Amino acid sequence: MRNFILISFILLINVPDFYSQQDAIIWKKAQKLTSCLTTDQKIAQTCQVTLDALLKVDANGQVIKPIEIDQKKCEKLIEQQQIGSVLNVSTHTLTREVWNNLLNTIHSAYKNGKTVAPVLYGVDAIHGANYVVGGTLFPQEIGLAATWNPTLANKMGEITAYETRASGVPWNFSPVLDLGRQPLWSRFFETLGEDPLLASEMGAELVKGYQGTNPAESTRVAACMKHFVGYSLPRSGRDRTPAWIPERLMQELYLPSFKAAVDAGALTVMINSGDVNGTPGHINKYLITDLLKNKWGFKGLAVSDWEDVRMLHTVHKVAASQKDAIVMAINAGLDMSMVPYNGPHEEYLNLFKEAVSEKKISMKRLNDAVTRIIYVKLKLGLYEKQLTPWNEYPKFGSEEFKNAAKDAALESITLLKNENEVLPLKKSEKILLVGEAADNLIFHNGAWTHTWQGEDTSFNTKGAMTFRASLQKEFGQNLMFEKGYDLSSVNGWEACQIENKEKVLQNASQADKIIICLGEMPATEKPGDVKSLNLCEEQQELVKALQETGKPVILVLLFGKPHIIREIEPKSAAIINAYLPGDFGGDALTEIFVGKVNPSGKLPYTFPKYDGVIEYYDYVNSESKTNKLDAKPIDPQWPFGFGMSYTSYSYSNLKIENLGAEKFKASIDVKNTGPKAGKEVVQWYITDEYASITPANKKLRHFEKISLEPGQSKKLVFTIDSKDLQFVNSTNEWIYEQGAFTLKCGDQSVSFEMK
């Protein structure tokens, strides 16, 4: 078996300079502007505070509503202390006009010559402009991944940028590029699924959509890759807790999506709040400086997450003092600290200055950090004196944007089961719809929607239709609705109670078919920690009672993460996974249910069957063995990439041709053999039959989503070269090895040899 080390592979060596001549000019300008600053001014550029630090508060220190800038605080922090960045929304979503007034007030200090640099403002607009009243809300990233359609990711990024910049905010803390391989994690719904290729392609398109070709345009924002890197695999499943990731797997699984985003031009990165292999992300010099900045050529800024520099001392216990924490983080390559409170920010400024005076942080490192910050500000056009007024964005909340969000929801919805073609529904049928999740937008959107946790129903988008409201328009009096259960949070944990079970069953007796929407309370970060993936007993009990009626029961899963439904799946006639589809998920679900649109979503993760077993599609051969006669060794509820349709597709004529020079051309014919037009995700997998490191069962190497009319067929071609056969070896080098391989596509497979 012959090894080939790929000396030029992107994850291991210095990459070419992808930045244009114009970027080089901007970089030199940033260096010049940095050189004109005093040490105090430079340090202040690295400090980021939350909006609340600038707002008026009452006698108890609570922000006064409606919010208003405290001019004295603004003068102190922005004009006198020259703080470089502000973030966040205060309490809840704001109108464009309010946002614009806030940003203009903050920007006026620079406009009037009272600061040396404009303030860089950032928010978490992770599934649309979710902190702007009337913003277009898309599916959460896990649903976006289920579309397997990079074009939709680009469109979501473009619209989110337009509507976020309409508020005046130029920096978006998105996309999340962490892999979704720990479903217990509270932020699983923010990921692009379990596969690095899928996450890379979808994530790169989000970046391109956010930034366009010129981030300084008034319709673009700076993207922020997060959370670099390994944050999403906590051993405990709880947020901000340790991960153990071998370097080989870090290279092969967790870094590629970030590398793809760097190649797409991402301007900023947010660092992992947790620790990996005992090293907190914020002091990992190898990852931040050696790899990201030096080897990958990343020229943008690296920002901490919320209070994470302080936590090096208070939580991680790797720094003996706050000063040590600052020294360790900045020297590791951090450029900006999300401090973020008024008061602690002064301690940060003072301790940072002491560290520079004591030569614990070099002026070279400080200059580099500030140059990166100013570079991003220049790239965004923030040195222009005037912000674009909020009312000069005619497409904000437009039908065009709403239709794009609905298209994303439509292509995300995944049909997992459809016995006896119980779907689509007929309008003549009497339908019982059950479930609180069907009748409240908070269960369609999840966290990061109008508020941090997304629980406050008072800010639900006016005019957006729940699944219940949308289905009612189609079925009129033929639709009955019962809430069925009540979800709430008690002491921080999700609680559920069955409501009016007798009434639910009474209406079930009058129905031809029953739809029950299952849901979870919206939550993220530490408030979203869970102890189990099991669906709550109350919802399961209600489903079982409805199944006992003998009527066809259809499950709709409105979950940000998979929940265990093993006990209720067998007697369910149909199951649809809607993820968290956004404000237009209700309309999208209705169009799927009545057959106006054919479902085309595919699972972006392996759907688990058992609470204690986490499986991935790229398992190794030893995991496929068992001595249990009545058990399958690999037994998910549904596999990665699975999704059904109202039509059928056939795969045929899989062929592979050796092109020489270590390249092969693969081709396959895909035909719509059913009665309806549809979209199919053609997935190409390669198996390395024997390797020096235990090979995966298969690896996704290419995918393409195509549209086919009934009877139509298309020939698809995939060119395979050495990079499609690579893996990371025992010395953490990307290599490929000559030998036998198997290409799989649909139900077809073909063997080939790389010589």
What are these regions (language model features)?
Residues 18-726, 733-745, 749-751, 755:
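Glycoside hydrolase catalytic-domain context in secreted enzymes
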Residues 1-24:
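Bacterial Sec-dependent N-terminal signal peptides
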